[in-house]
Each structure stands twice: as C-alpha cells, then as structure tokens.
Amino acid sequence: MFAFAIDDKYPVTKNHKLIIPRRHVRSFFELGNAEYKGVLELLKKEKEELSRKDATISAFNVGINDGKDSGQTIIHCHIHLIPRRKDDVSDPTGGVRGVFPEKRKYP
C-alpha cells in the first residue's frame, strides 16, 4: 500500500481525514504514478466508508495545500478529506474559494 489514512489532529468537521503517502514527498506533484493511483484509491475508499458509516454526511471537500505559500504547514504531501453536512455553515457558496473571502462569490 502506498498510503494510509488518519484522523486530522485539528479537524475542520467531524471525521476529517488525512490521506498520507508512505514515502516522504513534499509535494503532491512529486508522487510517482503508482503512488498517485494508490493515494487516490485510498481517498475514494475512505470517502465511501465515511458515507456508509455516517448518514448525516451529504458532501465532501477534498483539498491539498501544496507549498508553504498555499498554507501547507506539514511539509509532507497529504490530502484532506472533509465531510460536510447540510447546514454545517450558513452559506457554503464558493467552497474552497473561501480561502480568499473576496473571491468566494463569483458570477
């Protein structure tokens, strides 16, 4: 197996997971083809498992902070799998665009 999943130490929502490659790479873009495939297969498996276990989950955010200027604080590639639930925020419009609040709303 090329990756493993853990609970995020500082979860954004309940059951927030991290998908982490076993080999140390700083960037998602440094993954080899087999690693890339393995990481994404585990991401999908974890999503399916969470959906099966928790009927309140209605959507997911999937995110990668790649590089210090993106907000990456742990300099080892990892993917966030963040379960979302209806009404967990008052207005989810813009999704990950909320990183830049002024860009959150767009035509």
List where the protein language model places each region:
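HIT superfamily nucleotide-processing domains
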Residues: 1-107
